[in-house]
A protein has these predicted regions:
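Histidine-centered active-site microenvironments of extracellular/periplasmic hydrolases
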Residues: 293-300, 474, 478-479, 483-523, ...
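Polar, surface-exposed loop/tail segments
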Residues: 305, 526-531, 550-589
Length: 592
């Protein structure tokens, strides 16, 4: 009876916390987690059944409290911190870890109790160690009134021992003694609770053997280094991301010194008024759902871009553009640098578009509505961090829709040459969270038809953001050139997959804008872009396109790789995607 009650409790608390303290959950995520938590809750009471524990014992209570603290802490604190500023988040690994850790502790207690009542000290110490993270997180929140994030984790990993000692001293001896004594007392209580509990004397040896096997299964599932539950929990995953960012940053910055030491850049057309070149990087936008590229849509999804596509003097829309990869990291680490599918350069050895712009005399600014540090953000963040100015909306108190990026343009100095990058969240899943509900109502967009329609709505909202960026930059910053390109595409009616599921995953929008003054000063570039409208392109050549639009000569730029050059050499048969594995020429086989 007691194992059944515990299973129901763990499932109810876990799923209840998941639904209440996560935002913008996709429909399939709700059902998926319901099934996962139900299966987990059943599995974790198996050790209790094997050890014939039919009543609430102190070890069971301790394990249950440990599990509950893990289930609740990160989700609640993250929600309290981000509910007003983030339209969606799905934190489910702490809940899964909390449920499974109950089974792991129960199995550990059962095994150690068979050896000796005193062996319960192992379980008590394990529980104390496991509680360090949630208790520390609660303490962090009580001091700073915010959930720990990369801004809080970075100082922890980038602090010398002497600085740590100085910080501890600043807290005051009373607080330090209270915290240390409290944790020692908690550890002693957990050890005492597990000390005297022994297994029933008539427990068969084979039940211990099965319990040991269950314990081994839980151990691998929870603690394996690469894909275990523990390394995917909120705080631990954040720690790993920040650690990896520091490692990557050191490599990238070390390589930067070598890259820039021999980088030469010369503008072909000097002089002219201060102006701005604007690059907008989209997210998960597939041109198949954009009216400006594919007019046969259920409703107009890109009203502004469609109108601009008719202005062929200033705008060039490239209808044969593809991404080089299907995920953000491999796509952007190529798009933003020399590295491409067509050379053997390493990311850390490659000059970036920011390097080129700065060397050409532009003041560089990067504004992002994406994450700052994480497995999906690191390469872009490393490039962004070399800008003269880099800011993320995650530090803003406003809701993080892409429209919030427009305000950054008001802070740019119009008296100097500027290169500005806006990195959108675009049409990243979950699509219905990419635009405000008020926007959908104001524009008469359908929101009741599922993922595909919500995806089209996100495309519509991105169109409005592009219009606002264009108008603001034109009015304030003497916009001379603008480029819009997505990192990769997407198939909104299919579950996301690391496998290649069709060319919609890589069909992306690409267009350029040139002002009258730019066309007058750079006629060859303007003619090349117009002449190359129907040429094939993969976005690992975006770096070369931007070099061409800057109209520079450089030892790290080959004009034959740039759509902005009459020497552009690539033909349809040359183009590759999915990290060199798929030929763009095969797109005819998957036109649907």
């Amino acid at each position: 009876m007691i194992p059944t009650i515990i299973a129901i409790y763990l499932f109810a608390v876990g799923y209840g916390i998941f639904r209440r303290f996560n935002m913008g959950l996709a429909r399939n995520s709700r059902g998926q987690q319901l099934r996962r938590y139900l299966i987990a809750a059943v599995q974790v009471v198996i050790p209790m059944l094997l050890m014939r524990q039919s009543s609430f014992s102190l070890p069971a209570v301790c394990a249950l409290l440990t599990a509950t603290l893990w289930i609740v802490t990160y989700n609640v604190l993250y929600d309290k911190t981000n509910r007003q500023t983030s339209p969606d988040y799905d934190n489910h690994m702490d809940i899964a870890f909390g449920i499974y850790i109950f089974g792991w502790l129960s199995a550990l207690q059962g095994i150690t109790a068979a050896l000796s009542p005193a062996a319960g000290i192992v379980t008590g110490l394990a529980e104390a160690a496991i509680l360090i993270i949630p208790l520390a997180h609660i303490g962090y929140y009580s001091v700073y009134r915010t959930c720990i994030d990369d801004a809080g984790m970075i100082p922890m990993l980038d602090t010398y021992a002497s600085e740590t000692v100085e910080y501890v001293r600043s807290l005051g001896i009373v607080k330090v003694v209270f915290v240390v004594a409290g944790f020692i007392g908690l550890t002693a209580a957990l050890v005492a609770a597990n000390w005297q509990t022994a297994s029933p004397a008539d427990t068969a040896w084979w039940l211990y053997a099965i319990t040991a096997a269950v314990f081994a299964y839980f151990t691998v599932y929870i603690w394996k280094p690469r894909h275990g539950l523990f390394v995917r929990t909120g705080v631990v995953n954040l720690y790993i991301d920040v650690r990896d960012y520091f490692r990557g940053s050191r490599r990238y910055r070390t390589g930067m010194e070598q890259r820039l030491s021999d980088l030469s850049v010369t503008r072909n057309a000097e002089g002219g008024k201060p102006h701005t070149v604007l690059l907008v990087i989209g997210e998960s936008a597939c041109r198949d759902y954009m009216s400006a590229f594919e007019p046969d849509q259920p409703w107009e999804t890109t009203p502004w871009e469609t109108a601009m596509s008719r202005d062929r003097r200033h705008f060039s829309f490239f209808r044969n553009a593809y991404s080089c990869a299907m995920q953000t990291v491999p796509a952007l680490e190529r798009a933003l640098t020399e590295r491409s599918q067509y050379n053997n350069r390493e990311f850390s050895d490659s000059v970036s578009v920011i390097d080129i712009a700065r060397k050409a005399g532009y003041r560089t600014s990067w504004f992002s509505n994406q994450g700052h540090i994480g497995k999906n953000d690191t390469s872009a963040t490393l490039v962004a961090s070399t800008s003269d100015r880099a800011e993320w909306t995650l530090s803003s108190v406003e809701a993080q829709y892409d429209s919030s990026l427009i305000d950054f343009l008001d802070t740019i100095d119009p008296t100097v040459d500027n290169f500005v990058v806006l990195h959108l969240i675009g049409s990243h899943f979950n699509y219905e969270n990419r635009y405000p509900e008020s926007y959908a109502k104001a524009n008469g967009l359908r929101t009741d038809l599922g993922d595909v329609e919500c995806y089209r709505n996100s495309i519509h909202f991105t169109d409005s953001v592009l219009q606002k960026a264009f108008e603001k930059a034109s009015q304030r910053l003497n916009l001379e050139a603008m480029v819009y390109c997505s990192d990769h595409g997407g198939i909104p009616d299919m579950r996301r997959s690391p496998r290649f599921l069709g060319f919609k995953m890589v069909r992306i929008p690409l267009w350029t804008y040139l002002s009258d003054s730019y066309i007058d000063r750079h006629p060859a570039v303007a003619k090349a872009l117009a002449d190359n409208r129907d040429r094939y392109f993969t976005n690992d050549l975006l770096y070369d396109l931007m070099c061409g639009i800057f109209d520079i000569r450089s030892n790290r730029y080959d004009p034959s790789q740039s759509l902005a050059s009459a020497d552009y050499c690539y033909q349809r048969a040359d183009m590759l995607t999915y990290d060199n594995r798929i030929r763009v020429a095969d797109d005819d086989l998957d036109k649907a």
